[in-house]
C-alpha cells in the first residue's frame, strides 16, 4: 500500500550482522509458528464464526474475498488502515510478552515438543534427529529474547543499542511484527466473544492485514471506534481518507462500482 504523503523510512544494511544466522533460524521457527496459528484461526472460525487470523502474504486471499462478495452481492463499504511507523515503534517489553504467548500457544496446539530446523524450512517433531538443529518452546523464546537484546547499530565511530523498534532488515522482522499484531487482534476478538458481543464481531469477519496495512470490508468504520482497544498506544493506526467506496491496498487500487453491486477493479500502482 503506497502512503500519501509518502512516509520517510530509514534503512540500515545488515548483510554482515553477527546476528544474521540466529535471525535466519528464528525466521524458520516463526514461519512454522505462524502457520500453526493459521490452523488455530480456521478452527476458531468453525467454532465461533469469525477468524482471528488476519495475516496474509499475497493478494490471492484478497482476490478470493472479493470474488465471494461479488457472488453474494453484499459488499457495503471498504476501508484501509495503516500503522504509520510500525517497525520503529514496537516496544520490546510488549513484543517479548506477546510473542511468548504466541510461541507457547503454537507449541500447545501442535502437540509437539520440538521444532527441527533444516536448510530451507522447519517442522514440528517429538523425536528430533541427533544431528539436526532443534529447539523446544523455551529455547525459541530465549533465542528471540537474545536477538532483541543484541540489536546494535553503528553510525560512524559510534555504536548504539536499539531499545525501541526492530530493524526492517532483520530476516525475522516481518514475522515478529505480524505475530505481535496478531496477538492483539486474537485477544481482542476472543474477549468480545467471551462478552458475547456478536453485534460487534459481525463487523470484523472480513479483515485482512499485510504486515502494517489493514483492509476492512463491511466494517461500518467500527475499527475507528475500537482500534485503541485492540492495539497499544505506541502503534498508531490511521484510516485512509476515502469515502469508503474505494481505497489503496497491497499495491492496488480497489474500487466498488457506483452500481452498488460489489465488484472490484484492481490496478497496479507500481
Where are these regions (language model features)?
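Amphipathic alpha-helical/coiled-coil segments positioned at domain termini
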Residues: 6-10, 164, 269
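Non-catalytic, regulatory and substrate/membrane-recognition segments associated with hydrolase enzymes
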Residues: 1-77, 84-85, 100-104
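Short, intrinsically disordered, charge-balanced linker/junction segments flanking boundaries
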Residues: 1, 267-270
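Conserved polymerase palm-domain catalytic core
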Residues: 64-229, 242-249, 256-257
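Long, internal stretches of domain cores in catalytic or enzyme-like folds
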Residues: 237-241
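Inter-domain linker/hinge segments that demarcate the starts of reverse transcriptase
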Residues: 19-33, 58, 182-188, 193, ...
